[in-house]
């Protein structure tokens, strides 16, 4: 009976250690996934803004507006993630980028080439947010 109790205790300890060992890698993996998602959102937003600038250069204001609208969602996700991580300066820069995108979209709706300047400012704000 004593040997059975020892075996059960050792089995419980082994299962507990196995669980702890498996869970320890999960935190690092989850952080890696979140970092990759952040980079993906930033790259997606940048690509839409750059596409919008090309459309503005080609005087295709309708496509530019669509591209700028598509840039808002990843910018918002990136900003929210930065805020939740406590990166205040980066979140503020990302919020500024979002404001520039909205201004660019508004100008594009008026067929104003100044939208290109606002889109450029949005890219600078994104660069500022990601360089910190």
Regions found by a protein language model. Name each.
Residues 1-132:
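Long, charged/polar, soluble alpha-helical segments
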